[in-house]
Amino acid sequence: MVENSSSNNSTRPIPAIPMDLPDYEALPTHAPLYHQLIAGAFAGIMEHSVMFPIDALKTRIQSANAKSLSAKNMLSQISHISTSEGTLALWKGVQSVILGAGPAHAVYFGTYEFCKKNLIDSSDTQTHHPFKTAISGACATTASDALMNPFDTIKQRIQLNTSASVWQTTKQIYQSEGLAAFYYSYPTTLVMNIPFAAFNFVIYESSTKFLNPSNEYNPLIHCLCGSISGSTCAAITTPLDCIKTVLQIRGSQTVSLEIMRKADTFSKAASAIYQVYGWKGFWRGWKPRIVANMPATAISWTAYECAKHFLMTY
């Protein structure tokens, strides 16, 4: 007589899901600090350098002298700039972000891991902590932006069609505007980047826990989740990015409008944008910003997770 296999299967105990799965969202507690710094620096350089031409186009769109550019002619604009100004025109200033992005992102991810380690129990890898994750992200961007802001200011000045080098631009800004010019946009940068970073980490970790509950190293999932967080955060923070751009380029010789040149505070920059462009002015460059941030954030997270995985394995 053949036994009913379904009845036998129903009595078999269901194997328990192991709760001590490796957590690739954080380095182990015994990992030295330099592992986090190296992984963060690698991620930052990859993120900012690969998508630099799109970021340069966004800066031109947001600048006071930019003509109205639409997303449908974004590729034609890139082609036109490359043809009329040279192949490397949209790469002007990349040295500045490489110099700044490495140390700044080392601080960024290092601070994030440090805060998360002290706020969240290391043995609790299964529970999601969005509020503590957001706090960690906010602390991370506050620390890293203090280091990155001068380099970002230099980058945007060079992006506005100038042939000056990083050193020449730095010297020119300091001599004509003083040290404060490198930090005019820092408060606005924090207003923009604190929610950006908080949402970035929360959306990324929420989506990875949903798509990768086993916490396994999976570059495809890291890339997908990074794209989701990057595009979402870029879209909602575009108005603040427009204000930041005005503050960073106000002293450039390419800015001819007096109202833009005198905008040295958040409120003045916002008022100048509204007076010149209206409400639509706060969304100038939103499409190239998303196009740049979606792959850039995906690259950043994928590179960071890859570097962590490599350092943990080897």
Curated annotation (Swiss-Prot):
The chain crosses the membrane at residues 33-52, 93-112, 130-149, 185-204, 219-238, 285-298. It is a multi-pass membrane protein. Keywords: Membrane, Mitochondrion, Mitochondrion inner membrane, mRNA processing, Repeat, Transmembrane, Transmembrane helix, Transport. MRS3 suppresses a mitochondrial splice defect in the first intron of the COB gene. It may act as a carrier, exerting its suppressor activity via modulation of solute concentrations in the mitochondrion (possibly of cations). GO terms for molecular function: ferrous iron transmembrane transporter activity; iron ion transmembrane transporter activity. The keyword Transmembrane applies. Pfam families: Mito_carr. Its main location: mitochondrion. The gene is MRS3. Gene3D superfamilies: Mitochondrial carrier domain. It is found in: Mitochondrion inner membrane. Belongs to the mitochondrial carrier (TC 2.A.29) family. GO terms for cellular component: mitochondrial inner membrane; mitochondrial membrane; mitochondrion. Solcar repeats lie at residues 31-118, 128-210, 217-310. Present with 1360 molecules/cell in log phase SD medium. GO terms for biological process: iron import into the mitochondrion; mRNA processing. The keyword Transmembrane helix applies. InterPro entries: Mitochondrial_sb/sol_carrier (IPR018108), Mt_carrier_dom_sf (IPR023395). Coiled coil: none annotated. It comes from Saccharomyces cerevisiae (strain ATCC 204508 / S288c). This is Mitochondrial RNA-splicing protein MRS3.
